């Protein structure tokens, strides 16, 4: 691995996007051009009813697929640091650590009342098709 994975852990609407965007202002630091890569993380576990994954769900083929996605993205974009901030990872930190043990973690905490207020505004917002199109590019084919 010729790059350092950085995983931001935080609840939705807690500032993970803002932190990721600030970090990605530095040279050779980047991230996927979509908000989250939950479908990449769910590869091989699509049938799971929740985003909470145990360590034993990080089977060899699952780890290989996810690591390859990280490696390819970092290589294709000539990155020294690859920042990832899928909020669902807050429910599966041991799984993430099993897949990418060399990752460095940044934990972000925001007052729950503020998170709820921000989430309510987001939930009531109009559907953003350009946002959805960006995410679709990183949904693995079954």
PLM features per residue range, with description:
Residues 1-76, 126-129, 133-140:
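PAPS-dependent sulfotransferase catalytic core
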Residues 3-4, 78-80, 102-104:
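Short coil/turn segments at beta-strand junctions that form active-site/ligand-binding loops
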Residues 8-10, 33, 82-85, 107-109:
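Short beta-strand segments
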Residues 44-46, 87-142:
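PAPS-dependent sulfotransferase catalytic domain
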Residues 70-95:
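Glycine-rich phosphate-binding loop used to anchor ATP phosphates in small-molecule kinases
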């Amino acid at each position: 691995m010729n790059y350092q994975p950085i995983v931001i852990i935080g609840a939705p609407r807690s500032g993970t996007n803002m932190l990721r965007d600030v970090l990605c202002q530095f040279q050779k630091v980047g991230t996927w051009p979509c908000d989250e890569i939950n479908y990449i993380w769910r590869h091989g576990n699509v049938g799971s009813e929740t985003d909470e994954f145990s360590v034993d769900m990080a089977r060899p083929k699952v780890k290989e697929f996810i690591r390859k996605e990280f490696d390819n993205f970092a290589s294709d974009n000539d990155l020294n640091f690859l920042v990832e901030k899928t909020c669902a990872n807050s429910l599966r930190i041991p799984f993430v650590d099993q897949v990418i043990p060399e990752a460095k973690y940044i934990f972000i905490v925001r007052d729950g009342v503020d998170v709820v207020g921000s989430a309510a505004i987001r939930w009531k917002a109009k559907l953003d098709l350009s946002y959805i199109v960006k995410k679709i590019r990183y949904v693995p084919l079954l």
